[in-house]
Amino acid sequence: MTRPQAILTDIEGTTSSISFVKDVLFPYARRAMPAYVREHGGHPQVRHWLNQVADEIGEDVPDEVLITTLQTWIDEDRKHTALKALQGMIWEDGYRTADFSAHIYADAAIQLQAWHAEGIPLYVYSSGSVPAQKLFFAHSDAGDLSGLVSDWFDTEVGPKRESSSYRRIAERIGVPAPEILFLSDVIEELDAAKRAGMRTALLDRLEDYPTPRSADDVGSHQRVESFTQLVL
């Protein structure tokens, strides 16, 4: 098999630890959400996303109710585009004040840099908003890696467990789906990408999944425990 013409990667559980997102980013956004909405709720960009939350609830509600709803969605790990956008805005403050830096596995950072040097275009597809993705890579504990990525995709392109989303990405980057390798730790996402025609590899990191996924669960996806084990 020839080397892929492009590599598309997830973030959480793939390039980076699940615990960083769950234990650092989510709690930070939850704590900061009330003050952020009260202070910036009048800004058009922030209000746009708050209105989407209100539409989801189906009521004309005060901001205090929206704040409670957003905090509940964080607790539930809801993949709502408005929540992800607002979280990204809050995290931007955290990155810029150096409250934290984004975790990137060393093997992922090294391999992403190597692929970029070899001329393989790299793309990111995550449930986090595109601005949040860019901040994540720009403020990683391996340095600014944002320049390695050719383009970014979030749930505005479609849900990650639907094959149509991966077809749209292939169309947008102008690479045939069979020439794209998608990396993720979520089997349902890999299944969707494979249905769209992409090559797939499951990141089954022991740090995130102490019990390896079974062969039946992995199916036809390549299974690796780090980027260094990937066969292109």
UniProtKB/Swiss-Prot annotation:
EC number: 3.1.3.77
Pathway in which the depicted protein is active: Amino-acid biosynthesis; L-methionine biosynthesis via salvage pathway; L-methionine from S-methyl-5-thio-alpha-D-ribose 1-phosphate: step 3/6; Amino-acid biosynthesis; L-methionine biosynthesis via salvage pathway; L-methionine from S-methyl-5-thio-alpha-D-ribose 1-phosphate: step 4/6
Cofactor note: Binds 1 Mg(2+) ion per subunit.
UniProt xrefs under Pfam families: Hydrolase
Known cofactor(s): Mg(2+)
InterPro entries, per database record: Enolase-ppase_E1, HAD-like_sf, HAD-SF_hydro_IA, HAD_sf
A Gene Ontology BP annotation from the UniProt entry: L-methionine salvage from methylthioadenosine
GO terms of molecular function: 2,3-diketo-5-methylthiopentyl-1-phosphate enolase activity; 2-hydroxy-3-keto-5-methylthiopentenyl-1-phosphate phosphatase activity; acireductone synthase activity; magnesium ion binding
Record field: catalytic activity: 5-methylsulfanyl-2,3-dioxopentyl phosphate + H2O = 1,2-dihydroxy-5-(methylsulfanyl)pent-1-en-3-one + phosphate
Chain segments annotated as coiled-coil in the UniProt record: none
Keywords: Amino-acid biosynthesis, Hydrolase, Magnesium, Metal-binding, Methionine biosynthesis
Residues making up the signal peptide according to the UniProt record: none
Function: Bifunctional enzyme that catalyzes the enolization of 2,3-diketo-5-methylthiopentyl-1-phosphate (DK-MTP-1-P) into the intermediate 2-hydroxy-3-keto-5-methylthiopentenyl-1-phosphate (HK-MTPenyl-1-P), which is then dephosphorylated to form the acireductone 1,2-dihydroxy-3-keto-5-methylthiopentene (DHK-MTPene).
Protein family according to the UniProt entry: Belongs to the HAD-like hydrolase superfamily. MasA/MtnC family.
PANTHER family in alphabetical order: ENOLASE-PHOSPHATASE E1
Quaternary structure (record): Monomer.
Protein name: Enolase-phosphatase E1
Biological source species: Xanthomonas campestris pv. campestris (strain B100)
Designated gene of the protein: mtnC
